[in-house]
Amino acid sequence: MEKISRTKIVDLLKRRDFGAMVNVKGWVRTRRGSKQVNFIALNDGSTINNVQIVVDLANFDEEMLKQITTGACISVNGELTESIGSGQAAEVQARGIEVLGTCDNTYPLQKKGHTMEFLREIAHLRPRTNTFGAVFRIRHNMAIAIHKFFHERGFFYFHTPIITASDCEGAGQMFQVTTKNLYDLKKDENGAIIYDDDFFGKQASLTVSGQLEGELAATALGAIYTFGPTFRAENSNTPRHLAEFWMIEPEVAFNDITDNMDLAEDFIKYCVQWALDNCYDDVKFLNDMFDKGLIERLQGVLKEEFVRLPYTEGIKILEEAVVKGHKFEFPVYWGVDLASEHERYLVEEHFKRPVILTDYPKEIKAFYMKQNEDGKTVRAMDVLFPKIGEIIGGSEREADYDKLMTRIQELGIPMKDMWWYLDTRKFGSCPHSGFGLGFERLLLFVTGMTNIRDVIPFPRTPRNAEF
């Protein structure tokens, strides 16, 4: 076959130089036709849209054509022509076809509907479906938007360690990292494992957050963000939890809680606008196939100012809802860590727009959050979204050395793990704020998917680490 430079299908479908000879490569989605002419729907992953290849059967070897089945990979030389059918403006009249890879008849992605559960079992193949092709192209574009947003605002991208000795959230649900022989663990007289002879000379884990290290950078570089994988060993088999996921964590020197809320709202709106501007075909496909209100919901976020609501006021609204007969599975009272059903009631039923909940009780939030003058609450903020619940968690950080030290001692956090963090309050402490956004939570909102396992290529969940 004549050598012609390949054109990606996303670019080919925009061309109008009909009569030009082109080359496309991709995977066969469908093949149909008559005894004289076949029509092949070809996709190369660059777009949700297929290009139609028109094949005059008289011009091609019958044995070669038998190899062109759903899933086969082919290279096509042909003439770009104006399509007479509806759906797209251009198609390719095949002049030469090369089969690059045949597809066994056990190929599981045939032309029929597949359940999400089934597709999770074949995660190595599901990017070839329309749905997951769309999701993963959107995922790429959201990552680009994140870097672009922060770069345009003078933030520095800061890399924090994956292996750490600190537990930022204090949850203790961390994956251990060790080179020790698990069948011959040395223990002290109290039964605790001795790590002195381990690789790092101490107990080490996979990070649950890059925040603490990010704070160190913010107190030197001014404004930074992290974007990387994090790990939580929570035994939670829900549509909202993963053991391995990606986090975006900006930290900004001299920002107070109001600045932090402004940044969070601007950031989310930027990402949503980017999706609509750069991934519209994919978003439209997901809107039409799975969630008829997706585009309307995305556009609604851009139009509305986020409600800013103190936790105490939120509790009052929820208590009033209970009095009026609304049934919650979990109880509502001041001091409770709100469940997803509470968050979604505030967003979806009461305000009908995103809510930033602030000033949470000190006892249900992390040690590093700045305490309010009432002594009971901290300058925390959670951004709550429709269908998702919490999408961002953040706070103004405690900048006072003595208050931070007292809180660390109250919670029994070992000083040997925190001395370096306290140094930032000892040497030129400054007000600063930040937040964490779960990348996959953002993707749930932008794609309309209902299970977080469907917005990451290879989900890691309890008892599941395939591929």
Swiss-Prot record:
* Signal peptide bounds: none
Q: What does the UniProt entry say about where the protein is found?
A: Cytoplasm
Reactions catalysed, semicolon-separated, are: tRNA(Asn) + L-asparagine + ATP = L-asparaginyl-tRNA(Asn) + AMP + diphosphate + H(+)
The lineage, from the top, is: Bacteria, Pseudomonadati, Bacteroidota, Bacteroidia, Bacteroidales
**The keyword Nucleotide-binding is assigned to this record:** yes
Matching Gene3D superfamilies? Bira Bifunctional Protein, Domain 2, Nucleic acid-binding proteins
Instruction: Name the keywords, alphabetized.
Output: Aminoacyl-tRNA synthetase, ATP-binding, Cytoplasm, Ligase, Nucleotide-binding, Protein biosynthesis
Q: Which organism is it from?
A: Phocaeicola vulgatus (strain ATCC 8482 / DSM 1447 / JCM 5826 / CCUG 4940 / NBRC 14291 / NCTC 11154)
Transmembrane segments annotated in the record for this chain:
none
The entry sums up its family as follows: Belongs to the class-II aminoacyl-tRNA synthetase family.
For molecular function, the Gene Ontology terms on record are: asparagine-tRNA ligase activity; ATP binding; nucleic acid binding
Main localization (coarse):
cytoplasm
User: Gene Ontology cellular component?
Assistant: cytoplasm
Q: What is this protein called?
A: Asparagine--tRNA ligase
